[in-house]
Amino acid sequence: MAEAVQENPTELRGEAKKEAFHQEAESKIENFAFVRPDVVIPDNEKIHVKLAGTDSCRASVQILNKGGDNNLHYHPNMDLIYMVLQGRIEFYGPGDKSLGVFGKYEGIKLPENSRYWFRSVGDEEAHLLQIAGYPRGAKASKRIPVEAAKRGPSLWIGMTEEELRIRRENNQHG
């Protein structure tokens, strides 16, 4: 009888640890929705709207006016998946080589260190879903320009002051 009592607390302790592990993760579950912010986006510009993030991934929507684009760059510690939600986006690689023109619900996967840039090529405002994955615990993604920036950094909506500070410290715009 003493042995059974001795084994039982060990099992309970293991089960309790497992349950605490799951409860901690589940306490971080968040719902989100994309709502276009009521802001005017200057011609040929774009903004980012943060949807959600963890310490190993982030999702945001970039909103681009017609002609809105960025410069050739890469991310040494981030894999990217993009999908067009509205409008048309053309992605380019080095030498302005077209990687494809994408419409609604089409997209592209860009592994870390892939050099790319993109531009809104449709007649309407474009909404581009960005899903970024990076090493667990990374403070921020890195953005390394290959060519000079065409403008200053994009406006980010929905980020905390700390997230914005870290982003400024870790990103180069050319």
Regions from the language model: what does each represent?
Residues 1-58, 71-72, 143-174:
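A short, N-terminal "cap"/entry segment at the start of jelly-roll beta-barrel domains
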Residues 62-65, 74-91, 131-134:
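Short, conserved beta-strand element in jelly-roll/cupin
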Residues 118-122:
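Asparagine-centered strand-capping/turn motif at beta-strand->loop junctions
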Residues 55-56, 77, 96, 123-124:
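Short strand-connecting beta-turns/loops that link adjacent beta-strands
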